[in-house]
Structures are given as structure tokens and as C-alpha cells.
Amino acid sequence: MAKEDVIEVEGKVVDTLPNAMFKVELENGATILAHVSGKIRMHYIRILPGDRVTVELSPYDLTKGRITYRFIK
């Protein structure tokens, strides 16, 4: 997947799931399943329910995404 093909949206973490997966509610009200990107995992950035995050979505499957940024409160 090329970097230009991704869709970036903001959302709020609703629930924490096993294996660094999260349920994220997007701005438009849709709920998706998202995993943590490698850089966030590498720098031990903790993501908790209620955090605002940026999610990258693939145009091929809009129900799964990758968390690329956690906003500072």
C-alpha cells in the first residue's frame, strides 16, 4: 500500500482489545478496528480509552486501520 493511497481521519479510542488492537470511533460516527503503528510501539507510547488519535485507513477495507498519532491532552 503506497503512502499516498491512505485516508487519514481522526477518532477517539473507545475500547482496548488484546494484541495492541483498539476500537476507534471516527469523527463521522463509524467504529473501526485499529492496531498500533510500529513507531508508536517502538517508543512505548501508551494509548488508553478516551484518547484522540489519528488513524490511517486503506481505501480497500474501511473497517480496519492503523493508529499513527496520539494527540496530547
Swiss-Prot record:
Keywords: Cytoplasm, Initiation factor, Protein biosynthesis, RNA-binding, rRNA-binding. It comes from the Bacteria. The keyword Transferase does not apply. Residues 1-72 form the S1-like domain. It is found in: Cytoplasm. Transmembrane segments: none annotated. GO terms for molecular function: ribosome binding; rRNA binding; translation initiation factor activity. GO terms for cellular component: cytosol. The keyword Cytoplasm applies. One of the essential components for the initiation of protein synthesis. Stabilizes the binding of IF-2 and IF-3 on the 30S subunit to which N-formylmethionyl-tRNA(fMet) subsequently binds. Helps modulate mRNA selection, yielding the 30S pre-initiation complex (PIC). Upon addition of the 50S ribosomal subunit IF-1, IF-2 and IF-3 are released leaving the mature 70S translation initiation complex. Component of the 30S ribosomal translation pre-initiation complex which assembles on the 30S ribosome in the order IF-2 and IF-3, IF-1 and N-formylmethionyl-tRNA(fMet); mRNA recruitment can occur at any time during PIC assembly. Belongs to the IF-1 family. HAMAP family: IF_1. This is Translation initiation factor IF-1. The gene is infA.
